């Protein structure tokens, strides 16, 4: 794949949607084709699953068992990768997703107290081992981010302060375990300060991505040349 895959993570209210749109505009201004998507709900199937996950069955408050919840997220993600993410990457496009598998690891393994090994194994199977090139973790105290919410709470957002605190810590633990993929940004800063940190990092990431593609093409050309010369001989 020659595309670029970027995900945004963090507890609710940290400003992911705002920064996703800033990044989209920035990349499109540079002539890149950008696909913006989200989890759950990035496909038609995903929208139906999102309704169940965030609002319950028929909008009711019946709780979903942790294992059932994890399987629903995995089903959404499997369809998301197959239908939207992987095809776009294969076309050489940039994919930006508002949440990906790290949300499952943080919310289900951290917040819901399932084991990280269970959730990671399920998520990697569902995505056929597809990980983002960069994950921006917008970090903020949930007590502060909660005050930013401008809509009625969904099932996840109303889970309580202890759940949100465990989820935040789970995100930070994930970032510490994969420092080459994660870029942690203090989301309590202004929108412009957060964007400046993302902009500086994405410039480096784009340069590295172009260099990697050039290397692959050079190797491919050398290999093709060797075959041609062999045929002449």
Swiss-Prot record:
InterPro entries: P-loop_NTPase (IPR027417), Thymidylate_kin-like_dom (IPR039430), Thymidylate_kin_CS (IPR018095), Thymidylate_kinase (IPR018094)
Binding-site positions, ATP: 10-17
Species, as recorded: Bifidobacterium longum subsp. infantis (strain ATCC 15697 / DSM 20088 / JCM 1222 / NCTC 11817 / S12)
One Pfam family matching this protein: Thymidylate_kin
Protein name from the UniProt record: Thymidylate kinase
Similarity remark: Belongs to the thymidylate kinase family.
Gene Ontology cellular-component annotations: cytosol
CDD domains on file: TMPK
PROSITE patterns the record matches: THYMIDYLATE_KINASE
Keyword Kinase: yes
UniProt entry keywords in alphabetical sequence: ATP-binding, Kinase, Nucleotide biosynthesis, Nucleotide-binding, Transferase
Entry keyword annotation includes S-adenosyl-L-methionine: no
A GO MF label: ATP binding
Covalent S-S links between cysteines: none
EC top class named in words: transferase
NCBIfam families, per the entry: DTMP_kinase
């Amino acid at each position: 794949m020659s595309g670029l895959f970027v995900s945004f993570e963090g507890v609710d209210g940290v400003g992911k949607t705002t920064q996703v749109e800033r990044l989209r505009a920035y990349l499109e201004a540079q002539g890149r084709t950008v696909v913006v998507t989200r989890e759950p709900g990035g496909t038609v199937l995903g929208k139906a699953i999102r309704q169940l996950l965030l609002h319950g069955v028929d909008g009711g408050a019946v709780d979903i068992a942790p294992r059932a919840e994890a399987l629903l997220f995995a089903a959404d993600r499997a369809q998301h990768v197959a239908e939207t993410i992987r095809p776009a990457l294969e076309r050489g496009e940039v994919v930006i997703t508002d949440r990906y598998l790290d949300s499952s690891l943080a919310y289900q393994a951290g917040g819901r107290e399932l084991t990280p090994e269970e959730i990671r194994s399920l998520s990697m199977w569902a995505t056929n081992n597809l990980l983002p090139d960069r994950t921006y973790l917008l970090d903020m105290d949930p007590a502060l981010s909660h005050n930013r919410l401008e809509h009625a709470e969904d099932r996840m957002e109303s889970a309580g302060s202890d759940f949100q605190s465990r989820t935040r810590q789970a995100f930070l633990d994930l970032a510490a375990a994969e420092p080459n993929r994660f870029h942690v940004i203090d989301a309590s800063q202004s929108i412009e300060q957060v964007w400046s940190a993302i902009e500086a990092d994405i410039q480096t990431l784009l340069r590295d991505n172009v260099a990697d593609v050039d290397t692959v093409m050079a190797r491919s050309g050398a290999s093709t040349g060797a075959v041609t010369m062999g045929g002449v001989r």
